[in-house]
Amino acid sequence: MRRHRPYLDGVAAAAATFLLAVLLHAPLAAGEDEPPPWVLCGPYPPSGNYSKNGTYQVNLDLLSTTLPKNTSSSPAMYATGTVGDVPDKVYGLALCRGDANASACERCVAAALRDAPRRCPLVKDVLVFYDLCQLRYSNRDFFLDDDYFVTTYTLQRSRRVGAAAAAAFDAAVAVLVNATADYAAADSSRRYGTGEEEGVDGDSDRPKIYALAQCTPDKTPEVCRTCLSTVIGQLPKEFSGRTGGGMFGVWCNFRYEVFPFFSGRPLLQLPAFVETPPPPPSPSATSGEKTKNRIGTVLAIVMPAIAAILLMVVACFCCWKRIKKRRPEEQTFLSYSVSSDDIQSIDSLILDLPTIRVATDDFADTKMIGQGGFGMVYKGVLPDGQEIAVKRLCQSSRQGIGELKSELILVAKLYHKNLVRLIGVCLEQQEKILVYEYMPNGSLDIVLFDTDKNRELDWGKRFKIINGIARGLQYLHEDSQLKIVHRDLKASNILLDFDYSPKISDFGLAKIFGGDQSEDVTNRIAGTYGYMAPEYAMRGNYSIKSDVFSFGVLVLEIITGRRNTGSYDSGQDVDLLNLVWEHWTRGNVVELIDPSMGDHPPIEQMLKCIHIGLLCVQKKPASRPTISSVNIMLSSNTVRLPSLSRPAFCIQEVSASDSSNPYSERYPRPRHSGYSDNSTVVSSNDLSITELVPR
C-alpha cells in the first residue's frame, strides 16, 4: 500500500509549503522487484488537467522532441526547457544518472516522455523516475522551487538483517551514505557520487554496502548537501535494518544496496565500519615499544638507504657513459614517437616563434621568472593582452626533450581548474617551447618557505590550496580520460593564481596507466627527494599511492611552513615526517603549526589536516587512502579518520641530551602563547633525480 507524508527542507523551511513523500510497499510477485518507472501524477497541489490535442499537449509534444537530446548531449546529462506561453507553457527537467552513457540517457528520457502521458492522462504536472533517469514537466515554473518532492522506495528483495545486528548495520549504512553525499556535493561538474563500504568477513548481517547520491548539477554544494541531508534523515524511519532502499527527488536522490547496482568502479571506497575504535596506546607503552624496537627500526632504514645510494651511484655512472656515446642527432624531438591522435591534439595549439619573441621581448633577461630542469621560464604578453608563462628548452642542452614531449602530449589532453592550462606550443627553428597561462603568485614554495611572503598565506588560503591540489590529483587519478601518475608532485610544481587557487604543473615525469593498471616499476628513478614514496625511492615501484604520499608531504609542509628534508640518507637524523609524528604522539603537534598564520587559527581543522597528511605518508601503499577518500575526509565532518601508524622514513627520536635532538636550535619550537613571529626554514629539498627515457 502507499502512504503520503510531508517534509520541509531545513534551509528553505519558511518558503516551502510542504513536501510529499510516497512509500512504495505494494505487494509484488515473489522474487520480483517493483519495476520502474515510479510515477507521481500531480505531485504538487493540483494544477489541473489539459485538454486533449489542446495547446498544452502541443507544447508538451514539442518539448518531447528536444529534451532527450539536450539532456544526453550535456556534459552533466542534465537539461531544462520551456515551450509556449502562459497559461499553456510547459516547463521540463530531465536528469540522467551519473553512470549512464549518452545513448542510454537519451533513450531513457524519451521513454519517460512517452510513458508519462499514458500513466497520468491529461495531467499537467507529472514526475517520473526510471532507474537511469528522471523527468518532470509542469505548467508551473518549478525550477527555482525551494521545496522538494521525494518518493521513498524499497525493493522487494531487500531483506531485514537480524535484530541484534540492525543497529550496527544502520550505522554502517549511515556512514557510507553520508560520505557518498559529501562526495556528490563536492563534485563540481556532476554533483554525483558512488561509494562502497567493506563488509565484515564471516558476518552475513554485515555485507559489503554500495551507495549512490546525486543532485541536479545546477545546485551549489551547500544546497546539494542540504537536500541530501534532509532525505538521508529519513533513513532511520523508513529503512531501519533493511539491506536496501533509497529516495528519488526532483533535486536530489540517493540509494543504497548490498549488491552493485551502478556501473563502473565506486568513486569512494571505505573500510568496514567499526563501532568502537580501539583505544590509543598509553604513553608508557609507546615509550617502551620505542626503546625495544629502536635498533631494528634504524637498521631497517639505514641498510636499504645505503643500498639505494650505492645503486644510484652505479646508475649515474652508467648513464654518464651512455650519454657520452650518444650522437647529437640522436637526441632530437622527432626521435620520440608521437601518435596521430597526439599530433591532432597538439595541432590546434601551435604558436609561431615571432609571436613568442614579441611577447617576451625576444626572451629578455628582465622577463625571466624561473628556471626548470630543462631551461628558462619567461613572462610574456600575447597581442590580445593575455599574460603567459613561456617554458623554453635550452638549445645547448639535450636534457629534457623527452620531458617536454611527455608534458606537451599530456597537458594538451587534460582540462581541470586545478591543472595549469596549456595555451600553445612552438617547435620552429630548433626551438622547443611550451606556453602556459601565467600564474601571478608564482609557485607555492616561493611563498610558503619565505619568512616574509608566507604571511600572505592565512589558513583560509592554505586550506584552499590543500583542497585544490587534492581535487586536481583526483582528476588525474580517476576522473580524466587518462589515468595519470604525476610522479613529481612538490611545492615548486604547485602554481598559484591571483587568488591563490592552486594548479598542478610540470608533467614531464608523468606516466599513463592503462585499463585496470594500478602500479608499475622502473629502474630509472625520477623525482625529488623529500616527496618520493619509499617504495618508489628504494625499489622503483610507483602507483597512484606514490602521488598520495607526495600529497601528504605537501599537506604537512603547508601547515607547518617547513620543508621536508627527506630521510633517504642514513646520516639524516630527522625529517619533517618524523618531527610531526613525534609531536603527534606526544599530543603537542600544535607547536609545529606555522606561526605566520596569526594568533587564532582553526586548530581543530588543522589537526584534521595533519591527521590526513600522516595517513597519506604511511609506509605501506595499501595503508594510504585514495585521493578520492582524501577529498571526502577534507570536506566531511561525518567520516571517521582511520587510525595512524608511524609514517615512512621515521627514525626513532634521540634522547633529550643528544646534540642532534630534533627539538634543538635546528628545529626551534614556535612559542605556543600567541605564536612566535620567527619562522625557521630547514635545509632545502631541491635535489631532483631525473633519468630521461624515450616514451
UniProtKB/Swiss-Prot annotation:
Tree of life domain: Eukaryota
UniProt induction comment: Induced by benzothiadiazole (BTH).
Domain Gnk2-homologous, first and last residues per copy: 38-142, 151-261
Residue spans crossing the bilayer: 295-315
Signal peptide (UniProt feature, chain positions): 1-31
A Pfam family: PK_Tyr_Ser-Thr
Record: glycosylation sites: N49, N53, N70, N101, N178
SUPFAM superfamilies: Protein kinase-like (PK-like)
Record InterPro entries: GNK2 (IPR002902), GNK2_sf (IPR038408), Kinase-like_dom_sf (IPR011009), Prot_kinase_dom (IPR000719), Protein_kinase_ATP_BS (IPR017441), Ser-Thr/Tyr_kinase_cat_dom (IPR001245), Ser/Thr_kinase_AS (IPR008271)
UniProt KW ATP-binding keyword: yes
Entry's family note: Belongs to the protein kinase superfamily. Ser/Thr protein kinase family. CRK subfamily.
Function: Involved in disease resistance. Required for NPR1/NH1-mediated immunity to the bacterial blight pathogen Xanthomomas oryzae pv. oryzae (Xoo). Required for the benzothiadiazole (BTH)-induced immune response. Possesses kinase activity in vitro.
Protein name, per record: Cysteine-rich receptor-like protein kinase 6
